[in-house]
Amino acid sequence: MAKKSMIAREVKRKKLVKKYAAKRKSLLDEFNAAKDPMERLEIHRKIQGLPRNSAPNRVRNRCWATGKPRGVYRDFGLCRNQLRQRAHNGELPGLVKSSW
């Protein structure tokens, strides 16, 4: 189980990403459309002025059951240990253990 403070930090990051997504996208579109280097520099400074945790690449995928940051399967949102345990218990519909 991950520390509650780490899980809370990730929740806060997700909220910030959602809050600033539109503003960040519009600034990035302006940045890519600008031809003048000075104009690009000015827009880049505006992007840098946004909160650091509002960047989507700062968000880490975590297991929703345990909060573990590693070995998380995107399809289920579970870490490998929880995925195995829940699959054996039959809690994941459609998931079948392979045999050949």
UniProtKB/Swiss-Prot annotation:
It comes from the Bacteria. InterPro entries: Ribosomal_uS14, Ribosomal_uS14_bac/plastid, Ribosomal_uS14_CS. One of its GO terms (cellular component) is cytoplasm. One of its GO terms (biological process) is translation. GO terms for molecular function: rRNA binding; structural constituent of ribosome. Keywords: Ribonucleoprotein, Ribosomal protein, RNA-binding, rRNA-binding. Belongs to the universal ribosomal protein uS14 family. Part of the 30S ribosomal subunit. Contacts proteins S3 and S10. Binds 16S rRNA, required for the assembly of 30S particles and may also be responsible for determining the conformation of the 16S rRNA at the A site. PANTHER family: 30S RIBOSOMAL PROTEIN S14, SMALL RIBOSOMAL SUBUNIT PROTEIN US14M. This is Small ribosomal subunit protein uS14. It comes from Prochlorococcus marinus (strain MIT 9301).
